[in-house]
Amino acid sequence: NFFPESFFHKVYPKEFNYKKIFYGVESSLFKDLKPFNDRIKNKILNSGNIGNDKFLNKIINDIRNPKWNSYRCKILRSKCSKLNFVDYFSTINNDYVNDHYPLLLQKYQTAIAADTYTPVQKYWEIPAAGCLAFMEVTEKNEGLHTGFIDNETSIFINEKNYVQKFQEYLEDANNPKWKEIAQAGNDFALKNFNNDAGVSSLADLMAELI
């Protein structure tokens, strides 16, 4: 499981043993993508499901599922989708689902990975595709446990600073530091989150249990 241990035990019984295993990057899908400098740089990509922030919808969803509804789980991602310099794709009912997701990512220099409660697979798919990743990393979602480093392998954002961080990039998009951070994030993601490494870790776990 690639969730933080504290989150894992919020979902599963306390007596379940926990072992962190990262996976999700199928290396062959992230080869030969468009070079960073040839990508869209005046827009930031935001993708995945978001919540409906209309007042009545939030009330209904909070009654049905007060913690795990799509808005509560994706608060920052939902807010980002409203910005005029952000291109939003639902990745549902289009050409960029599942194995084709890297083909969407390669169009943009930058993309957003945001989740309220825990980092998800998007956090390493985005840098694996060579994008500069704007990652929601907070005390609540324990994003530090992924190993990414702010301003070295990604750019950390939260609900207070996300607009400022986006503008810092957009106002200086030609600065070579963005490409350097994207490349460092790419190297880190491909090395630590590829499926071969995940299978190896799972095999080690199985050996421990036998």
What are these regions (language model features)?
Residues N158-K177:
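C-terminal "capping" alpha-helix adjacent to the active site of nucleotide-linked donor transferases
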